[in-house]
Amino acid sequence: MQPRQRRFATTAGMEIAAWDWGGDRPIALLQHANGMCGATLALVAERLASWYRVVAIDARGHGDSSAPPAPDGYPMRGFVDDLTAVAEALLSETGHARIAYGIGSSFGGIVIAMAEADRSGLFERIAMLDPPIHPDDALRARLDPSGGIVDPRPLIAAQARRRNAVWPSRDSARAAWQDKPMFKAWQPRAFELYLAEGFRDRSDGQVELKCRPDVEATIFATSGDLDIFAAAKHVSAPVLLVRAGRGTLPPEAFEHLRRLLPRCTMRVPDVGHLLPLEAPDLTVQLLREFAATPAGDAAPADGGRASSA
């Protein structure tokens, strides 16, 4: 089934674009990683479409959604409000009581969890796929009293800001990127989807990233503005928390969040940060296994150890 593109208006004046795979099944709402777009989640969406009506949004500043000026147009709370507006519109048009599955990759996982914390019961269950969880001040002090732990976000933001936004063609971007470690880890079709939908055509014949470098950098720099540790106790839905075994995010922060979430199951598969683009089959396997667990049976926050998949 080919998805159709839709647009949802928010009370903040944003228009959020989305890819809708259609059908009358329970809804799975997907949120991509920073710098990506909803179309890049197609490999996961297509595999889930037998069980769910899958809708993958473009966050503001990404894909074909509204792109206000940075940095002021990108408060982290705005991403949560945008996603909630789309979820509520879908519930209104279908008559469903809850979104069956909220699935977020990287920063999308934080956005999904914060939306559930704000509006308890919005989701039947959620999945956070290697979300950017960094130690807060208290955890950082406990892990390293000497103060040697350095927050990587300013450096990552600076790197994103230097990214080349305009290219002669998609072919030139492909040639420059295809051997870089991040893109080599992706499934070939995921890379092609990013080239196709992550760029827009310009009138001068060149192509330009839809997610501007200053937008991506703003999100990296301010991703800690959403206090997921404080919000965790308000997340009533069962949570699948996935830490990428080959990722670079601190395991201690994941373990801390696991303890704080009321109903959390954690998995540590041997895969890199962008699971849906690198390992869509494994990603769907993890999602389906968690979906098969009765909603009330997710591991309690104080019980069980992280396991591998």
Describe these PLM feature segments.
Residues 98-143:
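Conserved hydrolase catalytic core segment
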Residues 11, 59-103, 142-144, 285:
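Active-site loop/oxyanion-hole signature of alpha/beta-hydrolase fold enzymes
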Residues 271-284:
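Catalytic histidine-centered segment of alpha/beta-hydrolase-like enzymes
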Residues 1-29, 49-52, 92-96, 133, ...:
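Alpha/beta-hydrolase fold catalytic core
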Residues 138-206, 220:
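Helix-rich cap/lid subdomain of alpha/beta-hydrolase
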Residues 260-273:
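Catalytic histidine neighborhood in serine/cysteine hydrolases
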Residues 189, 198-259:
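Conserved serine/cysteine hydrolase catalytic core
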Residues 17-69:
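Conserved HGGG/HGGXW glycine-rich cap/lid loop of the alpha/beta-hydrolase fold
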